[in-house]
Swiss-Prot record:
Entry protein name: Pre-glycoprotein polyprotein GP complex
Residues annotated as binding Zn(2+) 2: H442, H444, C450
Family stated for the protein in its record: Belongs to the arenaviridae GPC protein family.
Site description Cleavage, residues in chain: S58, Y59, K246, S247
Species annotation: Whitewater Arroyo mammarenavirus (isolate Rat/United States/AV 9310135/1995)
Membrane-traversing stretches: 18-33, 420-440
Glycan-carrying positions: N88, N126, N176, N352, N360, N377, N382
One GO cellular component term noted in the UniProt record for this chain: membrane
Keywords on record: Disulfide bond, Fusion of virus membrane with host endosomal membrane, Fusion of virus membrane with host membrane, Glycoprotein, Host cell membrane, Host endoplasmic reticulum, Host Golgi apparatus, Host membrane, Host-virus interaction, Lipoprotein, Membrane, Metal-binding, Myristate, Transmembrane, Transmembrane helix, Viral attachment to host cell, Viral envelope protein, Viral penetration into host cytoplasm, Virion, Virus endocytosis by host, Virus entry into host cell, Zinc
Gene3D superfamilies: 6.10.140.1590, Arenavirus glycoprotein, zinc binding domain
């Protein structure tokens, strides 16, 4: 397809070449004649007849196309997951899973009730310690992990979480969202879970989310859409993950053929004396960038580190090598001047950098690169003294001219045009054999006129209703 597009774009410049015009003419004639031969052979009519024999004379479009739907009953899912609901713009409830009798109360306020201490700072992985000595400590921690995971709590979004002492009348936890980025993210994620409410980030000052446990007394009505939003936001974060070290295997990075190649995406697994090659594309690499809990991802990070280290070493080595090359070139330049002086002293032809010779092709106005005309005993050499050199240079020049002319001619005849000419000619030759076969196109009732356009079945019946007598003798007839 790309060759055809480039071919059509070059049509104005193509037609200037006689050879291209001939190729275009042969291609068009071959394609037209091939289509005529195939139509005359009856192959297309025979295929249409077999598809429609015995059916109605009208066409049906979309016979196998149906509009279907599926209904998801969320009532089977929501009782087993935390159910969020909103009381007002600042108070929210998160009922525990399995239709628990308790709920986690969330309050967005500018009041600070807890202060930072060395023992009361928590994070999403150990949030359950804020609900210690509670009867449902495990489910409370699980529910809060779901909620914080829905807020996309990660190393970029890390609001401070402080645990409180319930026995002293304090709340279970306090999340500091005073920072503008933290407040905006909490507001956007909670609005998706609980629904639309007033933005608390408009008031510039301290902002906290106070978390406490209360009894569930139907303070607010639940919505299955809120539960589904909470599920969707945790769909890829609550999978059970196990990580085991398989020291029985040894992995090495290689290319698709098994050759060691640091920086590739193929791993060769060795198990005793056999090996297995596995290649991973950009999907696996992107997955590793998202989730780092696998040995494969750790190994890629290690290889990436080594590759960067090698690249840095190569850059430093290249810099040192460039400095060495510069110094050597300077020495060579000085050495060249010394050699020319020595050649002059020992009567050997040398270059005085004043006169140069080259081979010029007057027909194409092309010349070779100038070369130094050597000097001996204070005078320039005769042409016969370096005849072999300029003859060899002329051969190289002619070869270069012919090569350029060949490349220019090849460039004026696109490869797509040659392909079209070849395949159209092959298509035409193939259609000649089909035309000679004279493929039959329909069934004919013996002794009567041709039943076209009626399509008779094998028992001489047509769905159009004209031929109703079954079992009449038939014969195959070709295109008339």
């Amino acid at each position: 397809m790309g060759q055809l597009i480039s071919f059509f774009g070059e049509i104005p410049s193509i037609i200037h070449e006689a050879l291209n015009i001939a190729l275009i003419a042969v291609s068009i004639i071959s394609i037209l004649k091939g289509v005529i031969n195939i139509w005359g052979s009856g192959l297309l009519q025979f295929i249409v007849f077999l598809l429609l024999a015995g059916r109605s004379c009208s066409y049906k479009i979309g016979h196998h196309v149906e509009l279907q739907h599926i209904i998801l009953n969320a009532s089977y899912i929501t009782p087993y997951v935390p159910m969020p609901c909103m009381i007002n713009d600042t108070h929210f409830l998160l009922r525990g899973p399995f239709e628990a009798s308790w709920a986690i109360k969330l309050e967005i306020t500018d009041v600070t009730t807890l202060v930072v201490d060395t023992d009361n700072v928590a994070n999403p992985t150990n949030i359950s310690k804020c609900f210690a000595n509670n009867q449902d400590e495990r489910l409370l921690g699980f529910t809060m992990e779901w909620f914080l995971s829905g807020l996309e709590h990660d190393h970029h979004f890390t609001p401070q979480i402080i645990c409180g002492n319930v026995s002293k009348g304090e709340v279970n936890a306090q999340v500091n969202i005073t920072m503008e980025d933290h407040c905006s993210q909490v507001f956007l994620k909670m609005r998706r879970i609980f629904g639309v409410f007033k933005n608390p980030c408009t008031s510039h000052g301290k902002q906290n989310v106070l978390i406490s446990v209360s009894n569930w007394t139907n303070q607010c009505s639940g919505n299955h859409l809120s539960s589904m939003h909470l599920i969707v936001q945790n769909a890829y974060k609550q999978m059970i993950k196990s990580r085991t070290l398989k020291s029985f295997f040894a992995w090495s990075l290689s290319d698709a053929t098994g050759t060691d190649m640091p920086g590739g995406y193929c791993l060769e697994k060795w198990m005793l004396i056999s090996s297995e090659l596995k290649c991973f594309g950009n999907t696996a690499i992107a997955k590793c960038n998202l989730d780092h809990s696998s040995e494969f991802c750790d190994m890629l990070k290690l290889f990436e580190f080594n590759r960067n280290a090698i690249k840095t070493l190569q850059n430093d080595s290249k810099h040192q090598l460039d400095m060495i090359i510069t110094a050597v070139n300077s020495l060579i330049s000085d050495n060249t001047l010394m050699k020319n002086r020595l050649k002059e002293l020992i009567n050997i032809p040398y270059c005085n950098y004043t006169k140069f010779w080259y081979v010029n092709h007057t027909g194409f106005n092309v010349h070779s690169l100038p070369r130094c005309w050597l000097t001996k005993n204070g005078s320039y050499l005769n042409v016969s003294d370096f005849r072999n050199q300029w003859l060899l240079e002329s051969d190289h020049l002619i070869s270069e001219i012919l090569s350029r002319e060949y490349e220019a001619r090849q460039g004026k005849t696109p490869l797509g045009l040659v392909d079209v000419c070849f395949w159209s000619t092959l298509f035409y030759v193939s259609s000649i054999f089909l035309h000679l076969l004279r493929i039959p196109t329909h069934r004919h009732i013996i002794g009567e006129g041709c039943p076209k356009p009626h399509r008779l079945s094998s028992n001489s019946v047509c769905a159009c209703g004209l031929f109703k007598q079954k079992g009449r003798p038939l014969r195959w007839a070709g295109k008339v």
